[in-house]
Amino acid sequence: MKKYGEYKDSGFDWIGKIPAQWDNLRLRFVCELRNGYTPSKDNSDYWEDGTIPWYRMEDIRDTGRKLQEAKQYITEEAVKGGGLFDAGSFILATTATIGEHALLIVDSLANQQFTNLKIRKSLSNILSRDYFFYYLFVIDDYCKATTKTSTFPAVSMELLKNCHIVFPSFCEQTAIAAYLDTHCAKIDNLISIQQKRIALLQELKQSVITHAVTKGLNPNVEMKQSGVEWIGDVPKHWKVMPLKFTGTFGNGLTYSPKDVVDNGILVLRSSNIQNSSLSFEDNVYVSKVSRDLLVNKGDIIICSRNGSAALVGKSAFVDKELNATFGAFMMRYIPNIEKKYGFYLFQTAIGQYKGYFSTTTINQLTKTTIDEIKVPLAMAEEQAAIASYLDHKCATIDTSISNAQHQIDLLQEYKQSLITEVVTGKRKVTDN
C-alpha cells in the first residue's frame, strides 16, 4: 500500500495522522446546514399533484446514495421560506437511523430525519463536491460513534458542526474521487451479485412455503377448486376459511417516551423482526404492561403499520419464552392450530394478499382486513408434518442466504475501509 512521504498529527484521534501538506477545516466553515421537515399531512394542497421530490430514508435504502426520483412528492405550497435544498448539496441522517448520506441530483427537500449540507460558495474551488461525497462516509462513522444509543437517537449538532474535514489540493481531490468511483463501482457490482442471489433465494423460500401450505406434501392427493384465485386448487379433504377461524389477532401497546426505561419489559417493534426471525439489537423497554399484552412462546408478531409498505406484514415466530410485549404498530397472532404451521400459513396468506391487491400502497393491516383473508387449512395431523418439512427446507435456504449476506457484509466493510484510508491520507492513490 503506497503512502505519503511525510505525515502530521491531525489533532483528532478519530482521524489520526494526515499527510503533511493536507489542510483541515471544521464542518461549520465548510457547509451551510439546514434541517429537513415534513409538510402537514392534513393539508392536501401540500401533497396532491406534487412535483418536488421529498426524500425519506426509504429513498436511500431503495435507490442509493445519489437521489433524483423520490417515493413521495410535495407541491410548491409546502415549501417553507428557506426554499429547496439545492441540487449538488447533500443530506445526512442525523436522527433515528444515524449516519447515512446521499447526494441530491435535483432541487428537492427531505424529512426531519435529515440535515442538508451545502458546500459554501467561497470554498467551491477549494473543496471538491465529489471528494466531499466520499468524505461523508467518514462523517457517517463519526456520527454513529458520537451518538448515544437511545429510543430516539439524534446527532449533536454542535459536535457535527465541529467535525473536521481533511483534504489535499483540489486537483488531488479530483483524482481521489475518480479512483474511488472506479473501485467502489467494482465493489458495488460484487455486492449487487450477492443481493440478487439473496432475492432469488428468498423467492425460492416463499415458493416452497406457498406450495406446502396450499398443496400439501402428497403429490398424488386428489385436488379440488378452492374458490380463491391466489390459492388455486387444494387437497380435496382440506378446508378453506377466513384467517379469523385459525386464531386471534390483537393490536399492540401504545406508549410514550416517558414510559421508556433502561431495563424492563421488551417492546417488540418492526426493527425487531429481521428475516422472519426476532432480532434483539435495537431494543426499547417499558416498566409495566397488562398481562394480556405479554408475549408467549408460539405467538406470531406482525408489523401492521409502517411508513414503508414493503415492511408491512412481515412477521416472526416467538420460539422461546420472553419478558416482552409488542408495540402499537404491531399485531399479535395467537394460532389455535399447530403454531409453527400457523406461522407459515400467515406468511403465505399475507404475502399473496399484498401481491394480489397492491405492492406499494398498503401501509397498514387492520384486524378487520386480516380476519377476512381466506386461507387453505390442512387437517390437524398434517399440520405438524408440513411445519417440520418447512422448518428443514427453510433452514437450508436460510443458511445460503446467511452466507451471501456475510459476503455482502465483508464487501461493505472493505469499501468503508478503503474510502476511509484514502480520504484521510492513509493510502496514497495518486502519482504526484
Outline where the language-model segments fall.
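Amphipathic alpha-helical coiled-coil/heptad-repeat segments
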Residues: 1-15, 21, 167-221, 376-432
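A short glycine-rich beta-alpha junction/loop motif
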Residues: 7-10, 94, 108-117, 148-174, ...
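Non-catalytic DNA-recognition/assembly elements of restriction-modification systems
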Residues: 7-37, 49, 63, 162, ...
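Sequence-specific dsDNA recognition surfaces
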Residues: 10-11, 28-43, 58-87, 244-256, ...
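Generic structural signal for secondary-structure transition and capping sites
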Residues: 35-39, 60, 140-141, 206, ...
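Short coil/turn segments at secondary-structure boundaries
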Residues: 40-48, 147-149, 222-226, 256-263, ...
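Short amphipathic alpha-helical signal-transduction/dimerization elements
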Residues: 136-140, 144, 188, 346, ...
